[in-house]
Design a protein with these regions (language model features):
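Acidic donor-binding loop of glycosyltransferase active sites
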Residues: 180, 291-305, 316-319
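A short, well-ordered alpha-helix in the C-terminal region of glycosyltransferases
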Residues: 360-375, 381-386
Length: 392
């Protein structure tokens, strides 16, 4: 098949879960014998591309798209059916580039990476006879509804409750009724979509990177790590919760360190006052960061889809401590290959137990790695993907 993969960010460099998922999808399609072209946006938030990391044999095209959020744009969306956070990706140059590709190549399949690209559905349908499939990285209106519940009463909460969340819910439900197929990243998301449309659909998670292996940490300190972009509200709010409610109590009189890494640190974070915390900012090597931790924490309370960092850490044989939401959609076994907790008291108790019984870290990490290798093998997932698209 000749396949066009349309993305709202470059798949390289792989600095977040979405770019990793896109990059993996390109490779999975390629390994099944398909010829893949990638058309991606370069936005103000994600302006980079790393040509050295691109897959050989894949044609990559990029278009600069502003896509920045503004108050004026948010207010204007009150009078439009499309949520502003989606509408901001509409761009004439990107649209014309897409049309040129569709009219220049006879594609068999168009893969839109995320519901945000649904604004180009009509363009794809008009200029191509290819099957159109959306890969839903999340249920977006679920994320925003959960985020809304975390906010204090005010203008932002009112806007989300009365404008954006209802708009987004209608937009997502109407979009998936038009497409030819849907790929969800988690079975939880798939169950929602299955209630809304009868189009062919499947759940295919992000694969584990099986080339990686855990290495013993040599530092004398008990290291706990957090990895995530802090311009994403669930990460930011979850990190603050962990520091306030858990770390400030756990770290007292212990030789421990909490290392925080990720993109787009807000200035506010540098005003926080917590002991035994290292703010590392954006890092070059996420794998090395994970391998240097004894525990990876995922304290998020909103969002949907799948946390790629959980898959990565577990595949490296690391002990992951997460909220239930943080591990949602991933086949895990609480107490065996991961530790799940949702209250400060439970989190604190688990950390104290691991601090006193560090042999548990290796046992849980070993089980985690075993689970990732058996459940999230790239070859097995690529085979499922192949069966799905050939049946469309």
């Amino acid at each position: 098949m000749r396949i066009l993969q349309v993305c709202k960010k470059s798949p390289t460099p792989q600095k977040d879960g979405e770019s990793i998922a896109i990059h993996q999808m390109t490779r999975a399609l390629q390994t099944q014998g398909h010829q893949v072209d990638v058309l991606a946006m370069l936005t103000a938030k994600h302006p980079e591309k790393d040509e050295k990391m691109q897959w050989a044999g894949v044609q990559y095209s990029y278009v600069k798209v502003e896509a920045e959020v503004s108050v004026a744009g948010s207010l204007k969306s009150v009078f439009t059916p499309i949520p502003y956070i989606v509408e901001r990706f509409v761009n004439d140059i990107f649209s014309s580039t897409l049309v040129d590709k569709l009219e220049g190549v006879k594609y068999d399949l168009i893969l839109l990476e995320g519901v945000f690209l649904g604004v180009y559905f009509d363009v794809c349908r008009k200029h191509s006879k290819a099957k159109i499939v959306i890969r839903a990285h999340n249920i977006e209106h679920f994320i925003w509804r959960r985020h809304m519940a975390e906010l204090p009463k005010g203008l932002k909460q009112w806007y989300l409750k009365h404008i954006m969340v209802p708009q987004f819910e209608i937009y997502e439900k109407e979009l998936i009724k038009k497409i030819d197929g849907l790929i969800a990243i988690s079975p939880v998301d798939l169950a929602f979509f299955a209630k809304e449309t009868e189009c062919p659909m499947i759940s295919i998670p992000v694969a584990a990177n099986l080339k990686q292996g855990g290495v013993e940490k040599t530092s004398a300190k008990f290291a706990v790590g957090f990895l995530g972009a802090l311009d994403w509200q669930p990460n930011f709010l979850g990190l603050r919760w962990f520091l306030d409610e858990v770390w400030s109590k756990f770290a007292v009189e212990k030789d421990v360190v909490f290392q925080v890494a990720g993109r787009n640190f807000p200035e506010e974070i540098y005003t926080w006052s917590f002991g035994q915390v290292e703010l590392m900012g954006e890092i070059e090597d996420a794998e090395d960061f994970i391998l240097n931790q004894q525990i990876i924490v995922v304290p998020v309370f909103s969002g949907s889809g799948m946390r790629v960092k959980v898959i990565e850490a577990m595949s490296m044989g690391k002990c992951v401590l997460s909220t239930s939401v943080g591990a949602e959609g991933i086949e895990v076994h609480n107490g065996e290959d991961i530790l799940l907790a949702d209250s400060p008291e439970h989190w604190l108790g688990l950390l104290e137990d691991l601090w006193l019984n560090q042999e548990k870290l290796k046992a849980i990490g070993d089980k985690a790695k075993e689970n990732m290798y058996s459940t999230y093998s790239p070859d097995a997932l690529a085979g499922r993907l192949q069966s799905f698209i050939l049946a469309l």
